[in-house]
Each structure stands twice: as C-alpha cells, then as structure tokens.
Amino acid sequence: LVNNRIMLQEKFSKQPQINTLILTNNILDKKFMDKVTEIIENEIDNVNFSVDQLVAQMGIARTKLFTKLKAITGQTPSDLIMTIRLKRAAYLLKNNPELNISEISDRTGFSFPKYFSKCFKKKYHVTPQAYRKEEIQI
C-alpha cells in the first residue's frame, strides 16, 4: 500500500499534466487538492507567491498544510508550488510555440529565465528548448 502511494506520488510529480485524481482516494482529499491547485494556478505568474500566501488563502495552519500535502503528494508546499509551475511551463512549451523561454518563465512566476531553465532541467532532465523540440516532433 505504501509502495503504491509512493509510485502514485512519483507519477503525479513527473507527468506534465496536473491530475489530482492520481493522488486522492477520498472526496475530502480531492477537494483539498483541487483548492490548493486552483490557488497556485491563479497565482502562477506571481513571482512573490509563497507558502505563506497559500496558507492564508487556504485558511489553515502552516503545519497542517505541510502535513496534509506531504501525506497526499509526498511534497512540501514549496515543492508543490514549483511542481505546478513547471507543469504549466511544460504545457506552454508544448502548446504555445510562439512564446519564447523568457515569456514562459514570466508566465510561470520565475524571476529569471536562467533559473527557470535550471529548475526545468532538474525536473524533466532536459532543457526547455529540447523539451519543446521533443514535444513538437511527437
């Protein structure tokens, strides 16, 4: 059971879509994750968006948010924010070839394109440019 949970968390983390159904096995967790995801997506271009703002918008204690997200996703709140930013970037790279890397970096809340590229490569093991070429050829 624990191994299945870990596999699902890894699958959620690695796939480019945001699909909370993979992670949740009850309606309360699904609603919780939908709300967290919605808040992060609404603030995705906000460079200053932080865990503190997520906590305030969720209306729960920081430790409660941390514990619940860690249990469901296997990630800390800041890691989840980064994961969702990078998933959006992957989507934009695939579906918006007219946007350059700097524009995608801005639209996903990164202050600097170089930092965005570094984070993207760490997550997907390929640069944003290479990911775009790979995805467009498919």
Residue map of PLM features:
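Receiver (REC) domain switch/output surface
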Residues: L1-R5
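Short, Lys/Arg-enriched anionic-surface-contact patches
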Residues: L23-M33, Q75-I84
